[in-house]
Amino acid sequence: MKKLTVLACMCLSFSFSQIINAQEDQESTFDKIWDNVVLYENVENSLMSKFWLTGRLQGEYHSFENEVAPAIDHDDYDWRRFRFGFKATLFGDITLHSEADLGLENRGRPLYNDLTDTYISWSTENGMKFKLGKQSAPFTLDGSTSSKKLHTLERSKIAGNIWFGQEYFPGISVSGSKDEIDYFAGFYSNDNKPEFDGAFKHGQFGILSVGKDYAGNFDLEKSYLRLDFMFQEDDGNDDVEDFNDWNAAYSFVTKWENNDWYFWTDLSFADRKNGDVWGLQLMPFYDITDKTQVIFCYTHLDSSGDNQLRGSRWEDRLDRGEYRGDDLTEYFFGLNHFFYGHKLKWQNGLQYTQLDEADGSKEYEGWGFTTAFRISW
């Protein structure tokens, strides 16, 4: 524990020492570098007016420990995500996007894992957007946030317990805004196949979201409130055993912002076949400068079923295997530095997690630290 705390303090102190105000020529350099992903652009070409590369590369060092006897700890460097693909604008208003998840840690296995975003989309004149294909299914605060734009190192434990652990599903969605009310509706296959061969063979689910910014009512820059609804049906196929425990889930998301202060929340509930789950996430953060940000996040989940809550990615990967309980609490402290917005950033996080089993005994209690670079294009 002492080594972990010292390491965290050293890294956080070092990151504070690197805080600088970016100059205009630095921004210009970043602009020139990122402009290189556009391989073709010609607005007069009615067939294909633009073609550019997309992707993300996320590397990190993490150190986690479980103090519950027998105590165990683990630290390692890891390529968290590597995705690569393209986007093309066709026939003026149609977008074709395809991206693959590639495993740089796939030792002895193929580099290719699966497709993530692979869809076509188009918009009407009034701003209604349709999307068909494999796409992100947005639900809960962090579940509706791209991994490129997370303010924490990982999605919250609400996203992993109230919502599916998987993000991309084959389906169709429509989104837009009407009379200042944002809306989203999606219908998806709940399969976990790498491409499209399992689409709608095991079951399906739907998502409906409505949101509105009430900034004028509260005299703030942003006061956004959103309700998410998810309903699912499946045939109990073992191929989708990660998802067939859900009947429905609901989420109330708020985003309060003013000047350099932010306060985002998520209150969620899942109707699961083996016990209901509710969760609360409170996430205030503050911009120290236009490039540097401090963040705190409190998350708590409680389950009426025995031992169906799970820890995060690295907590679960300690040598003793997966940890399960029915009462889960996490405190997260973070420091982010944005060199080029979310496209190039350095993130640091220190977290404390406690997971209790149904009988009251501790399943997991310990600290974790992660420092990471996130690049996207």
Model segments located where?
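Generic detector of N-terminal low-structure segments
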Residues: 16-18, 281
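N-terminal periplasmic/intermembrane-space "pro-region" immediately following the signal or transit peptide
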Residues: 18-58, 377
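Outer-membrane beta-barrel pore domains
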Residues: 24-30, 65-72, 108-110, 119-123, ...
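Short, well-ordered amphipathic alpha-helices
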Residues: 35-39, 206-214, 332-336, 372-375
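Positively charged n-region of N-terminal signal peptides that target proteins for export
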Residues: 1-4
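Bacterial N-terminal signal peptides
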Residues: 8-15
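Inter-helical turn/loop segments and adjacent helix faces that build the functional surface
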Residues: 194-198
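Outer membrane beta-barrel
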Residues: 39-192, 202-207, 211-216, 229, ...
